């Protein structure tokens, strides 16, 4: 009976120790209930003591002692049900000077004065995960990329329950973090769209705001009116809803009366969405200029635009007719313009003729000259031969014997054969030179 009673008492003590309220509301709760942080932070949902270690599980020592920290999860406002903050607390220097070992001081319940709240980090910038379930080690990764490893430091009979609570709490915190990031992204996008809408409609519809921001210049500058090319306003096509020109008389009464002195002739070709002109029929012959954010837009009469278009079309037609005439004249001319019987000296002292004759080289010209001289020499030889024969024929038959006639024929044949052999051997040399050689 005595043994049974003792066992019952031990079980009751253990059950009393395992009550969640006992270790959930600990030292951090006492600090927060002190009055300094009460209006801003709710009581922590979960609180535990950890020792800072490295990735391999080796403890990190600060001031020759293990660096331990108390971690608590809470919400920044008591109204919020979900936690969104992480609290970090450390021992004061006085508490670290105690002669007892550090592990024993952690197991003992300490007063509220031994802890100091040092960090107050939003869970949006923290990522919690289980690094080692066997060693009861957590990983804390901050938004700047740094990672810290915390190993649970609790009594043996509490370690499993406390660590299981952290394991159950971590996925809930990560889900809330994902939801908050999605909501923040949507809100940021909506703020951006609203800001762009406001910036697009702010002060642009009101022309008086531009007049207040930008001072007016009383002097008007005159420019020459011989500007034929049209100004390109394609860069300013995004200026939508700039002006609603409903009453031109109001614009003229407000002080834009010096428009007639401006003699700029330009064409507004691509500014289609800038203005909505409803009552411009009364001011048909007057040009209206508006100065909006440094851009001058000149409205012209329709007659001027039509005349300009007609002038452009006329010039284009005139140019096309001239081109066609020149082409037809060039095609109708049977013979191209040539320079007949004119020799032009070039760098190499060569000559060419432009009477639709092939260009002759130096060798061809030299051969022609040699042929001409040889023909002249042959004609001279024939004339001399004829004269000799005539003189011989005048002689009487009695004076000329048969032997002399045969001798003259023989000499003539030899001369002709010698001449042919020399011509064949000398090639393109002139025949006059051959004749002189024969005479010698």
Swiss-Prot record:
Its main location: other. Coiled coil: none annotated. Keywords: Cell projection, Cilium, Flagellum. It is found in: Cell projection, Cilium, Flagellum. InterPro entries: GARIL-like_Rab2B-bd. Expressed in testis (at protein level). One of its GO terms (cellular component) is sperm head. GO terms for biological process: cell morphogenesis; flagellated sperm motility; penetration of zona pellucida; spermatid development. Seems to play a role in sperm motility. Belongs to the GARIN family. Interacts with CALM1. This is Golgi-associated RAB2 interactor protein 2. It comes from Mus musculus.
